[in-house]
């Protein structure tokens, strides 16, 4: 890692620690070039602005002597033009600082995996860390398998899931595992761009196309040529622009705003929404023909409340680098906090968990996260269903006595129903871990199948 700011280098080291890689940090371009005489790295993370030379100078020197070493640029002074220039001169990717942990891990993990030809995480989706994701639950292993299966295809992928579940991380994982992984990944958030600017953001514009268009500008479609175009929150796109997008998908050609010339590109489409896309079609907010064009391989990201013990795995990973970043000493959670995390519904999903832990780490001190440190609403008592609603006591005859496992099964099923199908929440009320319920349900299903035979 070539980074002249020690605190930033330490932060990014903590982000990458879960990947289990050896990181050597230098502060100048000259030291970076000199270090190659002693050891050839699998990857170089390179700051664009250094005290003795530019990142572009370092890139040229490295590529001259070691052309196969992948380089990823990092800069707080990024622009689209700089990104394009860096990619043109051999940079594998381009990250804008401050860089989020998930984005950095996905990019670095993929670059190293491709450079060394080792596909440990892709070949073993049961690992706790997979392409930037954290978690080994059954629901996430199905996501990993879908990514592995779909990555090599050019077919469009439609990612659905609640806000905060990691849809952009998923899109980057698909791109990273694909044959286009060394080509650009360009993301555009359809909900964050004003209606009158989104066409220009997507297709670009020529000088004088509208007030303020002082120069020609490339759009996301052109920048993604050869790679992946990620359309986030696609269902927010205006119907008129959906028509132009459909034509672009069908033909691979588009016109810049203000231009009559057609441009042709080769991109792989990945899109995402936190809505039900078919419901949007039925209610007239999303074109049906566009839906069928894009909804080729559906991929649903489960909400955090359905990921069982992943909650605690993610929490520990976040706690590690947040404590390091903030200069704190937190290393563990109390059992009460673990139980509360497992029982909470997490309506904001992983993003909410990140914010909760950031709040705790910044405002408190110690080695253990305790219940009194939790911010609202996690510090409020759980709204437990009435026991009388779960099990109605009644007298029974000898003929009505059931095996103990069936009685336990009935109690657990009623608790799950009372919690609207939320197994982790039901587990919290029953004072057992979610994995215990999953294991029992699997065993009971096997017993019932044998009884049928």
Curated annotation (Swiss-Prot):
It comes from the Bacteria. One of its GO terms (molecular function) is ATP hydrolysis activity. Residues 133-362 form the Sigma-54 factor interaction domain. ATP binds at residues 161-168, 224-233. Keywords: ATP-binding, DNA-binding, Nucleotide-binding, Phosphoprotein, Repressor, Transcription, Transcription regulation, Two-component regulatory system. Residues 1-112 form the Response regulatory domain. Involved in the regulation of different processes depending on the cell density. Acts together with sigma-54 to repress, perhaps indirectly, some genes. This is Regulatory protein LuxO. It comes from Vibrio parahaemolyticus serotype O3:K6 (strain RIMD 2210633).
């Amino acid at each position: 890692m070539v980074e002249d700011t020690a605190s930033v280098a330490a932060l990014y080291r903590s982000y990458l620690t879960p990947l289990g890689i050896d990181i050597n940090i230098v502060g100048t371009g000259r030291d970076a070039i000199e270090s190659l005489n002693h050891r050839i790295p699998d990857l170089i993370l390179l700051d664009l602005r250094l005290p003795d030379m530019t990142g572009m100078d370092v890139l040229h020197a490295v590529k001259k002597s070691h052309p196969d070493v992948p380089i990823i640029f990092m800069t707080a002074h990024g622009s689209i033009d700089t990104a394009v220039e860096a990619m043109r001169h051999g940079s594998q990717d381009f990250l804008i600082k401050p860089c989020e942990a998930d984005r950095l891990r996905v990019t670095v993990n993929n670059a190293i995996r491709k450079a060394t030809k080792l596909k440990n995480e892709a070949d073993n989706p049961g690992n706790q860390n997979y392409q930037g994701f954290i978690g080994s639950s059954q629901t996430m292993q199905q996501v990993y398998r879908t990514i592995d299966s779909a990555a090599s295809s050019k077919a469009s992928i439609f990612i659905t899931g609640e806000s905060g579940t990691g849809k952009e991380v998923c899109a980057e994982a698909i791109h990273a595992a694909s044959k286009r992984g060394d080509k650009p990944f360009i993301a555009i958030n359809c909900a964050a761009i004003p209606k009158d600017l989104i066409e220009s953001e997507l297709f670009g514009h020529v000088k004088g196309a509208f007030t303020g268009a002082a120069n020609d500008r490339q759009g996301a479609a052109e920048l993604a040529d050869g790679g992946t175009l990620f359309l986030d929150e696609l269902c927010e796109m205006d119907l008129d622009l959906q028509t132009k997008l459909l034509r672009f998908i069908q033909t691979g050609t588009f016109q810049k705003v203000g231009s009559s010339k057609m441009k042709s590109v080769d991109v792989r489409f990945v899109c995402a929404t936190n809505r039900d896309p078919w419901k949007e079609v039925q209610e007239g907010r999303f074109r049906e023909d566009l839906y069928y064009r894009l909804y080729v391989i559906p991929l649903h990201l489960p909400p955090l409340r359905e990921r069982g013990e992943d909650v605690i795995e993610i929490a520990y990973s976040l706690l590690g680098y947040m404590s390091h970043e903030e200069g704190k000493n937190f290393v563990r959670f109390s059992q009460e906090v673990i139980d509360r995390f497992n029982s909470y519904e997490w309506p904001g999903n992983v993003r909410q968990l990140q914010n909760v832990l950031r709040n705790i780490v910044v405002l408190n001190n110690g080695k253990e996260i305790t219940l009194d440190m939790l911010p609202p609403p996690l510090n409020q008592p759980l709204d437990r269903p009435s026991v009388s609603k779960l099990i109605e006591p009644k007298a029974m005859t000898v003929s009505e006595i059931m095996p103990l496992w069936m009685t336990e099964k009935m109690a657990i099923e009623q608790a799950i129903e009372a919690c609207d199908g939320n197994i982790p929440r039901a587990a919290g009320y029953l004072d057992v871990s979610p994995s215990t319920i999953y294991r029992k349900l699997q065993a009971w299903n096997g017993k019932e199948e044998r009884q049928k035979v």
